[in-house]
């Protein structure tokens, strides 16, 4: 059986990993074994944080909506419940955007929610 050399494949793999590790500090960007460990860890962090980002943004939106709703004399959960009963289907991302950039429109939504809660 002929001998199989691995040099070309190994060099390609090493170059790929070291390219991904570019910008890392010290040996993590120079030595293949250390760089490979760091790249694998970095990919795990990226995977985890892509999921965490969704939770973090939802938390931020809720905080902004709550702050704006309280400025209009209403708590977050009462506001959301009032909108739900009124049949207003605006997601939290858009509500947070309105709360920050268009307080007048947000105030009108608060009035709609208040009216719906009082009419039950």
From Swiss-Prot:
What InterPro entries does the record point to?
Answer: Ribosomal_bL20, RIBOSOMAL_L20_CS, Ribosomal_protein_bL20_C
Record's keyword terms, sorted: Ribonucleoprotein, Ribosomal protein, RNA-binding, rRNA-binding
Q: Which Gene3D superfamilies match?
A: 6.10.160.10, Ribosomal protein L20 (1.10.1900.20)
Any one cellular-component term (Gene Ontology): ribonucleoprotein complex
Among its keywords, does the record have Ribonucleoprotein?
Answer: yes
Question: Which GO BP terms sit in this record?
Answer: ribosomal large subunit assembly; translation
Q: PROSITE patterns, from UniProt?
A: RIBOSOMAL_L20
Q: Which GO terms describe its molecular function?
A: rRNA binding; structural constituent of ribosome
* Family, as annotated: Belongs to the bacterial ribosomal protein bL20 family.
What does the UniProt record say this protein does?
Answer: Binds directly to 23S ribosomal RNA and is necessary for the in vitro assembly process of the 50S ribosomal subunit. It is not involved in the protein synthesizing functions of that subunit.
NCBIfam families listed in its UniProt record: rplT_bact
The molecule here is called Large ribosomal subunit protein bL20
Protein source organism: Desulforudis audaxviator (strain MP104C)
Lineage of source species: Bacteria, Bacillati, Bacillota, Clostridia, Thermoanaerobacterales
Q: Which gene encodes it?
A: rplT
């Amino acid at each position: 059986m002929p001998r199989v050399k691995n040099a070309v494949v190994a060099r390609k793999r090493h170059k790929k990993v070291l390219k991904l590790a570019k910008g890392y500090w010290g040996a993590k960007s120079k030595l293949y074994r250390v760089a490979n460990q760091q790249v694998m860890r970095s990919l795990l962090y990226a995977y985890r944080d892509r999921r965490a980002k969704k939770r973090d943004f939802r938390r931020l939106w809720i905080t902004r909506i709550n702050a704006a709703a309280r400025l209009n004399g209403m708590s977050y959960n009462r506001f959301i419940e009032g909108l739900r009963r009124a049949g207003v289907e605006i997601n939290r991302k858009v509500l947070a955007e309105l709360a920050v950039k268009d307080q007048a429109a947000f105030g009108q939504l608060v009035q709609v929610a208040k009216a719906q809660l009082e009419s039950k």
